[in-house]
Amino acid sequence: MKKLLLIAATSATILSSSVSFAEGMDHEWYLRIDTGAAMFNEEKDKATGVKLKSNTTVPVALGIGYYISENFRADLTLGTIIGGKLKKSGAATNAPFTRTNVSASHKPTITRLLINGYVDLTNFDMFDVFAGAGVGPALVKEKITYNGITGLSSNTKNRTNISYKLTLGTSAQIVDGVKVELAYSWIDDGRTKSKNVIYQGTSVPTGGMHYQSHNLTAGIRFDI
């Protein structure tokens, strides 16, 4: 809870600074919403050694930003994921579970607050091509479950990481004051906390997944 309050306070400070900076400039502010599909990089389960694969998750983000110049803009976004999971069934390779058939699942909860900057690389009559980058805090935790091994499932607590984002996309104006975007983003949300679980007298490491994702999103920006 304290970490969430800290993120909220950071957000308020950044927005206040942005408002003060923009008040002396004749540029428009905008609201934005983005959603789409994402997949995590493959990771190996620490306890069993099973290589986990991602399902398709839904990233969602809301934000506020402003146009600094004709070809440059910045925004602050709050984002999360819906339904993300790393999972796989197979034979364990790590002791004490070697050759045990197991199904491992890691379900993350990720909340990120990013400061983003974008620059238009080219301007065509119908659309623009842009590149961007973002950075900010992310709260990351996960629920870990195993089928085939009793007593190993666990939950990790929230960990605050620094999240990074790189973006390449295109945008087009559909009506005055409204633009749509299609973008690819790579996001690194860092690792979850590691946790040792006692299994039949043996300390077994779990957690510690590194969540990096490839995102394809559609977004819309409304001038305000």
From Swiss-Prot:
Coiled coil residues, start to end: none
UniProt keyword annotation of Metal-binding present: no
Signal peptide (from-to): 1-22
UniProt-listed InterPro entries: OMP/PagP_b-brl, OMP_b-brl
Organism expressing this protein natively: Rickettsia rickettsii (strain Sheila Smith)
Protein name: Putative adhesin A1G_07050
Keywords of this entry: Signal
Domain of life where this protein originates: Bacteria
